[in-house]
């Protein structure tokens, strides 16, 4: 996502206006809490029931008044503006907290890029910062980003829109720590072919674990929370009867397993969006591109339309290298323009069926897929990246994110086309 931020060097009247705005926000919070809760002092409000799209009733988390007030004052430290259109890059925690950050900042400042998607919780389940020791996820913390506040202050100064990436259900760390929240193969936590484990989307405690991390990212000052791996493991439909796992509140025998998976994934997104509303952040979800081509992906539980109804931004991962023969294209990696063009047409049709469609901001490819083998891939560079951007723009999609797992991005690209 890309963003333009206001100058952080406030002087004179601008400084005074900021102070006034902060007090207005605090006053509004106090009045709102007085109207809508029974909170007194540091007491917590009773849990409120929230009915999810699937009909499940779920309790929203308690909120403490002092924490809530502090949260909003804290958010007002930074002033970010949503950009004309988000044009962003993926940034690992190692890059964000190391020397690579300066190189990536230079790339953004010298081009029309304007956003960074920064790992806060990576796909191993590790946090890229050190939370307070009292947090339930504290032991997942690392020192990759030693001073998140310093990072965000620098991004504010440079007008780089900050997005926190939170990987949800792919979490080897939590699966091993809490096997009862995962999938068991006999007595062991199940692993995929790459040795990675997932936690169980049916388990409400897993939802809360991740939502609390997202809330902390919002409190840090990130303007958007991007949830990734919001799904069951790939191919789960082939092993759902072999593995041992809780189905939580999704045990209704009248509903088939595919629909239970879809309901659990969609319910998590809806719940997370609701929980994050008081923080004033946008919520986005990464989703497999092929999910938009199906009524729903049977194994992983992703329904493109249902998820899109509960987010501000939908980010389909449409890397040409990740498609088999599709849209009449035998070898999609060799034809990035055509693949992205055809996908964008289909996605526009799907989103056009929704009453309130989210912003479309696809992930596009800035890497070379050598693993596809000779004759099935091409070297990706300036032309291939621009072809994908041009295809999106021709279909009215002006936002995009670039993926390169090592954060080595192509130079000389015209990102505005």
Model-flagged regions — what are they?
Residues 111-145, 237-245:
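Aromatic-lined carbohydrate-binding/catalytic grooves of carbohydrate-active enzymes
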């Amino acid at each position: 996502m890309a963003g333009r931020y206001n100058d952080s060097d406030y002087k004179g009247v601008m400084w005074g206006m900021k102070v006034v705005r902060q007090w207005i926000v605090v006053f509004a919070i106090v009045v709102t809490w007085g109207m809508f809760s029974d909170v007194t002092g540091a007491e917590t409000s009773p849990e409120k029931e929230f009915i999810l799209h699937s009909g499940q009733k779920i309790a929203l988390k308690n909120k403490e008044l002092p924490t809530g007030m502090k949260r909003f004052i804290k958010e007002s430290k930074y002033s970010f503006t949503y950009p004309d259109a988000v044009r962003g890059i993926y940034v690992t925690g190692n890059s964000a907290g190391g020397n690579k950050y300066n190189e990536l900042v230079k790339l953004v400042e010298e081009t029309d890029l304007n956003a960074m998607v920064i790992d806060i919780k990576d796909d191993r389940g590790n946090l890229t910062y050190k939370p307070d020791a009292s947090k339930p996820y504290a032991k997942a913390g690392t020192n990759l980003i030693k001073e998140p506040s310093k990072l965000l202050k620098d991004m504010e100064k440079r007008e780089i829109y900050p997005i926190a990436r939170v990987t949800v259900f792919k979490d080897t760390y939590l699966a091993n720590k809490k096997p009862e929240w995962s999938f068991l193969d006999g007595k062991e936590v199940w692993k995929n072919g790459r040795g990675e484990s997932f936690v169980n989307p049916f388990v409400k405690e897993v939802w809360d674990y991740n939502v609390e991390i997202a809330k902390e990212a919002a409190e840090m000052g990130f303007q958007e929370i991007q949830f990734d791996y919001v799904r069951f493991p790939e191919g789960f439909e082939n092993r759902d009867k072999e593995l041992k796992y809780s189905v939580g509140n999704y045990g209704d025998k009248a509903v088939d397993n595919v629909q239970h998976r879809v309901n659990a994934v969609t319910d998590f997104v809806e719940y997370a969006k609701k929980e994050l509303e008081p923080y004033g952040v946008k919520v986005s979800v990464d989703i497999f591109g092929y999910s938009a081509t199906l009524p729903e992906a049977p194994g992983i539980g992703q329904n493109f339309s249902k998820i899109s109804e509960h987010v501000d931004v939908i980010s389909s991962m449409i890397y040409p290298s990740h498609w088999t023969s599709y849209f009449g294209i035998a070898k999609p990696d060799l034809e990035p323009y055509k693949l992205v063009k055809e996908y964008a047409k289909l996605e526009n049709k799907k989103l056009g069926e929704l009453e309130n469609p989210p912003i479309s901001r696809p992930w596009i490819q800035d890497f070379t897929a050598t693993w596809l083998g000779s004759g099935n891939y091409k070297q990706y560079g300036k032309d291939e990246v621009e072809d994908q951007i041009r295809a999106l723009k021709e279909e009215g999609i002006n936002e995009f994110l670039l993926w390169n797992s090592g954060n080595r991005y192509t130079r000389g690209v015209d990102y505005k086309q």
